[in-house]
Design a protein with these regions (language model features):
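Phosphate/NTP-binding elements of NTP-utilizing enzymes
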Residues: 1-212
């Protein structure tokens, strides 16, 4: 995929028969959202663990799809955004190739030591803030000992953008929602640490949370 003047390399394609939507008619080759288990807390531990392993694998590695006859790589960040990032309207984002390409460039910039970031020229109201908010939350909650911040041309806009990340965290499915102290009142920062009262028993029951 071309991103400006740079060629963005994607992961090696698997055999087509291993791609999602293989064998379907072109009209049926659409992106499909993950089916989240109901009453996750009530599932037995082994079922929770297996589900968590599958979700973390996709979050880290992404997956290849066949969409309308085309091979499309949905990166881990894009997959996370489409399946788990709840918008202010209370729904998941609509699948769009624009977002797929954005996250491919996002990951390229993140992993290239010679790249200092992205300069994005875009129209208003295309969901750019939500895509970036999801990307920041994704990185901040999947890696240990990482600091992530945001700046804007005035404090009001920065606060508004930060609130979107907090809202996404509050709506996050349990399998990806880090533990936070119960007394943690989010004002200027969102901190993920084990509460002092988090017992050894609780930690043992939730050891699948360390899959990241």
């Amino acid at each position: 995929m071309l991103g400006g003047e740079l060629l963005i390399e994607l992961p090696v394609k698997p055999p087509e028969k291993q791609m999602r939507n293989y064998g379907l008619k072109i009209k049926d080759q659409k992106f499909k959202y993950e089916k989240l288990p109901e009453n996750f807390d009530l599932l037995d531990y082994d079922t929770q663990l297996q589900y968590a392993k599958e979700m973390y694998h996709l979050r880290h590695n992404g997956e290849w799809w066949i969409i309308k006859g085309q091979h499309v790589y949905v990166s881990g960040h894009a997959w996370f955004f489409f399946n788990f990032w709840i918008l202010p309207e209370g729904c998941l984002p609509t699948f769009r190739m624009e977002a797929v390409e954005f996250y491919n460039a996002f990951e390229y910039a993140m992993w290239d030591d010679d790249c200092f970031g992205l300069l994005i020229i875009k129209a208003r109201q295309e969901g750019g803030t939500q895509k970036v908010s999801s990307g920041l939350y994704d990185d901040g909650s999947r890696h240990k000992d990482v600091l992530i911040g945001m700046i804007s041309y005035d404090e009001k806009i920065a606060r508004s953008s930060f609130k979107k990340i907090v809202a996404g965290h509050n709506s996050m499915h349990e399998v990806f929602k880090p533990k936070t102290p119960k007394s943690n009142k989010v004002v200027k920062e969102l901190e993920f640490t084990l509460p002092a009262s988090f017992s050894t028993e609780d930690k043992a029951k939730n050891d699948w949370r360390g899959l990241e």
